[in-house]
């Protein structure tokens, strides 16, 4: 029997009015903020770099809609409306065709990108660095910035960002604290891309996920998606849920252990937009209903000393052959990676397993985003 809890028409946050105000305040920070996301700041580029980019900016600026033209930072997925995403995906399709040595492979020649990561990363950092390199740009990089940089000496994030931006034209930041990217963007003149801020947002992952859904099932309207695993700590599911509200008739299913259920702020966000969502404890029954199964790992690093809660959540929902048998032939399985044990490697060869194609799509979407942010 399926154990399912349907949302009520008037969702109430259990902690009362105070928490409601806090949640609404938090959600407001995820909406477009002209002071952070769209601005007219003058970038501090040398005149030589500006001259190098003049021709390229002239070539592409007329092609961007007003939304992408005004985009100065990429801090959360709520910045992107449907037309902006669709336009970005068209550019991503073009980026997938860029060949080494071609004219387009030199689009960002003379530009420098800094990747500043306070948390460990393989895919995201290398994806951004590969994206910049494939377009001819240069890279200055540091990983474990909190341990080996001036942050270890007590420097504030704001001071670090002001300094780093003076060395480059764009900064890609990953930080362990939710809201850190928005805080950094407020003091910067160079464009900032949020590569993940703790349990908060991961906007470029959301963009590549939406792009992958379009590629895999052929539509972005009228489909059902299940988010599975660590929904409390997974910034990818939060960002993707927000992004998908920009499309029509998308229905959400949340399948998670009790200790890592989807947080109330996202449920409220969906309710306020009239988006249907369901919580379920039955993965097989849910798999039979959906077009996209989005699995996530249980994030041990977010549990701290609560190892007993981690053990309760670990291994509860695993995608194996029985789950694949429940999926329709036209469905797909996605995962932001890395995985631990939540997807059986035996199903990797199934044509519906899209997670490695998903990772490759991230390269093209990030190439597109770098082009948009740097070539105005």
Segments predicted by a language model, with ranges:
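N-terminal chloroplast transit peptides
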Residues: 1-38
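A short helix->loop->beta-strand "cap" motif at the edges of active sites that frequently abuts
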Residues: 190, 248-250, 326-332
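Phosphate/diphosphate ligand-binding glycine-rich loop within oxidoreductases
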Residues: 102, 106-214, 341-343
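Glycine-rich phosphate/diphosphate-binding loop of Rossmann-like nucleotide-binding domains
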Residues: 118-131, 215-296
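C-terminal helix-to-coil terminal segments
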Residues: 26, 61, 349-376
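Rossmann-like adenosine-cofactor binding region
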Residues: 270-347, 352
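Positively charged, low-complexity intrinsically disordered leader regions
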Residues: 63-126, 130
């Amino acid at each position: 029997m399926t154990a399912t809890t349907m949302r009520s028409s008037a969702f109430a946050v259990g902690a009362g009015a105070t928490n409601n105000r806090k949640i609404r305040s938090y959600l407001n920070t995820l909406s477009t903020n002209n002071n952070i996301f769209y601005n007219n700041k003058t970038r501090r580029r040398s005149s030589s770099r500006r001259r190098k980019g003049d021709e390229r900016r002239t070539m592409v600026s007329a092609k961007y809609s007003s939304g992408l033209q005004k985009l100065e930072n990429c801090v959360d997925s709520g910045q992107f409306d449907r037309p902006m995403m669709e336009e970005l995906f068209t550019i991503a399709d073009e980026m997938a065709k860029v060949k080494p040595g071609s004219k387009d492979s030199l689009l960002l020649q003379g530009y420098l990108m800094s990747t500043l990561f306070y948390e460990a990363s393989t895919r995201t950092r290398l994806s951004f660095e590969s994206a910049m390199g494939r377009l001819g740009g240069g890279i200055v990089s540091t990983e474990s910035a909190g341990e080996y940089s001036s942050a270890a000496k007590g420097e504030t994030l704001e001071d670090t960002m002001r300094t780093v931006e003076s060395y480059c034209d764009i900064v890609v930041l990953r930080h362990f604290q939710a809201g850190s990217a928005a805080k950094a963007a407020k003091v910067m003149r160079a464009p900032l891309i949020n590569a993940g801020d703790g349990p908060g947002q991961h906007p470029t992952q959301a963009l590549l996920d939406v792009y992958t859904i379009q590629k895999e099932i052929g539509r972005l309207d009228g489909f059902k998606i299940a988010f599975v695993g660590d929904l409390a700590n997974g910034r990818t599911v939060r960002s993707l849920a927000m992004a998908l509200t920009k499309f029509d008739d998308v229905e959400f299913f949340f399948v998670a252990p009790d200790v890592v259920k989807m947080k109330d702020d996202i449920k409220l966000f969906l309710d306020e937009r009239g988006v249907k969502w369901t919580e379920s404890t039955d993965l097989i029954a849910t798999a039979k209903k959906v077009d996209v199964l989005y699995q996530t790992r249980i994030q041990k690093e977010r549990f701290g000393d609560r190892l007993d809660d981690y053990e309760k959540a670990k291994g509860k929902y695993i995608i194996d052959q029985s789950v694949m048998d429940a999926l329709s032939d036209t469905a797909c399985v996605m995962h932001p990676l890395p995985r631990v044990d939540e997807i059986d490697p035996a199903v990797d060869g199934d044509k519906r397993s899209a997670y490695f194609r998903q990772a490759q799509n991230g390269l093209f979407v990030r190439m597109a985003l770098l082009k948009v942010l740097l070539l105005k």
